[in-house]
């Protein structure tokens, strides 16, 4: 009978071409079932159905097709074991040399709106993973193909060597087990959500699985000596994988980190917010501003720190228009992202071909968890943005902020949440004037922010991501002419900071929300 191949695919791409080559060039006998057998028969390719071969019909509406000793014995038999060979002969089982399987589209099914649990359950493949795992386990003797991209490489192996080489079979087995692991994880995650219906979703389960598909091998990581890859989760592109790169080179590791930081800040200014722009350097905002128009917002964000903005990452909360494109091209920028891009902007942007320009309509869509590796494991925390609710804030000083100052405090609070701790933001007229980021002591961050702001601090506001342990930060703010302060509160010495604010006539608001960022 010669060599035998079992083909059972939900994705018919390249199937007929592979099957025809197996039969015509290499004399394979083909086994198949269901829709795959019909596709081959329609193409005029000789095929034996699994039911004909095993003598057992498909049952349970097709739920049981390939789960049979004649199938799995043929796949799992070790060709170098006389006892295995004897067992095959005794049971009239033919060795199966090639298994070509891909799985029911479970992830694609659950991604559809309003899918029912019953519909999802029917897309849980049983026979497919069983075939794949059996063939992958016996890769010393069997080749398993789980993706159409492998078909031509396998045929080349046959044409060059007469059979697939051990290294190729091992690589195929690795890909096969990765596929089944990813598939099972998608099922487990879905059922976990279904189980949690009506309750808070469990995002910190006792066993936490993380898998991703490699989207892109990056040129390098944070530094040229570090290798890096970009992986995506889920069946459909989302987040940055769904962004459209309009121009410029492929994204780098640092670009992606900075873009995500920019997305986080600009997401604070969506919805009914005025036009806004954010400029990021090394994942920290260096300029954030609102404006009457998008170009005004960008120019004000740029003016907030012209030096740091060079080579920065820009995020906009409105479609990129021609006037803003013109302003963007006046300096060197690594990346620009907006929810959309107007046609008038495209020819202007092309004058800066190295500037990466992206559109991402869903700038607001954030991950639900943050993951950080440590030696021997990793940490997972929920990303649960706290709503900005001034009604829940507490004015702790004799002086209350005016409505205009309260609006400014809200603006500064939105920004400071996204600055590395210890973090201080000084703003005035909806424009950051000075940002102190990543300092080991809070008063040091205050001094940096006030120094950067200079005279622009006078009449402005100061936001802190954590409480003031001493009154020195408030005293420094008073000397610079700060009119209002917003901070979490909660220090043992809060009374000293309040006293210093009262002495200077500064309004101070406690949010009771800390926003450390490491």
UniProtKB/Swiss-Prot annotation:
Q: What is its EC number?
A: 2.1.2.3, 3.5.4.10
Give one GO term, molecular function aspect: IMP cyclohydrolase activity
UniProt keyword Ribonucleoprotein, yes or no: no
SMART domains found in the cross-reference section: AICARFT_IMPCHas (SM00798), MGS (SM00851)
Which pathway does this polypeptide act in?
A: Purine metabolism; IMP biosynthesis via de novo pathway; 5-formamido-1-(5-phospho-D-ribosyl)imidazole-4-carboxamide from 5-amino-1-(5-phospho-D-ribosyl)imidazole-4-carboxamide (10-formyl THF route): step 1/1; Purine metabolism; IMP biosynthesis via de novo pathway; IMP from 5-formamido-1-(5-phospho-D-ribosyl)imidazole-4-carboxamide: step 1/1
Per the record, the GO terms for biological process are:
'de novo' IMP biosynthetic process
- What range(s) does the MGS-like domain occupy? 1-146
Q: PROSITE patterns this protein is in?
A: MGS
Name the keywords, alphabetized: Hydrolase, Multifunctional enzyme, Purine biosynthesis, Transferase
Q: Which InterPro entries match?
A: AICAR_Tfase_dup_dom_sf, Cytidine_deaminase-like, MGS-like_dom, MGS-like_dom_sf, PurH-like
- Return the Pfam families for the record: AICARFT_IMPCHas (PF01808), MGS (PF02142)
Q: Which reaction does it catalyse?
A: (6R)-10-formyltetrahydrofolate + 5-amino-1-(5-phospho-beta-D-ribosyl)imidazole-4-carboxamide = 5-formamido-1-(5-phospho-D-ribosyl)imidazole-4-carboxamide + (6S)-5,6,7,8-tetrahydrofolate; IMP + H2O = 5-formamido-1-(5-phospho-D-ribosyl)imidazole-4-carboxamide
Q: Which GO terms describe its cellular component?
A: cytosol
Domain statement: The IMP cyclohydrolase activity resides in the N-terminal region.
State the similarity comment: Belongs to the PurH family.
By what name is this protein known?
Answer: Bifunctional purine biosynthesis protein PurH
């Amino acid at each position: 009978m010669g060599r035998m191949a079992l083909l059972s695919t939900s994705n018919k791409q390249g199937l007929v071409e592979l099957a025809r080559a197996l039969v015509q060039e290499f004399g394979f006998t083909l086994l198949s079932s269901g829709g795959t057998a019909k596709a081959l028969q329609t193409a005029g390719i000789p095929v034996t159905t699994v039911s004909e071969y095993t003598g057992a019909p498909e049952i349970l509406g097709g739920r049981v097709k390939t789960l049979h000793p004649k199938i799995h014995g043929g796949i799992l038999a070790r060709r170098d074991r006389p006892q295995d060979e004897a067992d095959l002969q005794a049971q009239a089982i033919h060795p199966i040399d090639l298994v070509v399987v891909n799985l029911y589209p479970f992830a694609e099914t659950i991604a559809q709106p309003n899918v029912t649990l019953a519909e999802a359950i029917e897309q849980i493949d049983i026979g497919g993973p069983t075939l794949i795992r059996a063939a992958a386990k016996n890769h010393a003797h069997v080749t398993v193909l789980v993706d159409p991209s492998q078909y031509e490489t396998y045929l080349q192996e046959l044409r060059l060597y007469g059979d697939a080489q051990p290294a190729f079979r091992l690589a195929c087995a690795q890909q096969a087990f990765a596929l089944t692991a990813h598939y099972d994880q998608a099922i487990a995650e879905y059922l976990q959500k279904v189980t949690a219906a009506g309750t808070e979703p469990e995002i910190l389960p006792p066993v936490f699985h993380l898998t991703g598909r490699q989207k892109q091998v990056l040129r390098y990581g944070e530094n040229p000596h570090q290798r890096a890859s970009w992986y995506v989760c889920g069946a459909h592109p989302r987040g940055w994988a769904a962004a459209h790169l309009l121009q410029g080179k492929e994204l780098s590791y640092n670009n992606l980190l900075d873009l995500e930081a920019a997305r986080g800040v600009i997401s604070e200014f969506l919805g009914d917010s005025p036009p806004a722009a954010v400029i990021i350097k090394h994942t920290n905002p260096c300029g954030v501003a609102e404006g009457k128009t998008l170009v005004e917002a960008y120019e004000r964000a740029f003016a907030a720190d012209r030096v740091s903005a060079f080579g920065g990452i820009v995020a906009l909360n409105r479609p990129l228009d021609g006037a803003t494109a013109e302003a963007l091209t006046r300096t060197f920028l690594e990346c620009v992202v907006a929810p959309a891009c107007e046609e008038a902007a495209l020819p202007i942007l092309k004058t800066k071909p190295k500037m990466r320009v992206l559109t991402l309509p869903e700038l607001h869509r954030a991950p639900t968890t943050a993951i950080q590796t440590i030696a021997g494991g990793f940490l997972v925390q929920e990303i649960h943005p706290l709503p900005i609710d001034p009604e829940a804030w507490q004015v702790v000083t004799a002086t209350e902020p005016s409505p205009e100052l309260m609006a400014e405090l809200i603006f500064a609070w939105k920004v400071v949440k996204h600055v590395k701790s210890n973090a201080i933001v000084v703003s005035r007229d909806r424009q950051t004037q000075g940002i102190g980021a990543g300092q080991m002591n809070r008063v040091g961050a205050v001094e940096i922010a006030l120094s950067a702001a200079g005279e622009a601090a006078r009449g402005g506001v100061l936001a802190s991501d954590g409480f003031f342990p001493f009154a020195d930060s408030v005293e420094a703010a008073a000397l610079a002419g700060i009119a209002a302060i917003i901070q979490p509160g909660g220090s043992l010495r809060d009374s000293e900071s309040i006293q210093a604010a009262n002495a200077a006539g500064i309004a101070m608001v406690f949010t009771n929300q800390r926003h450390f960022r490491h």
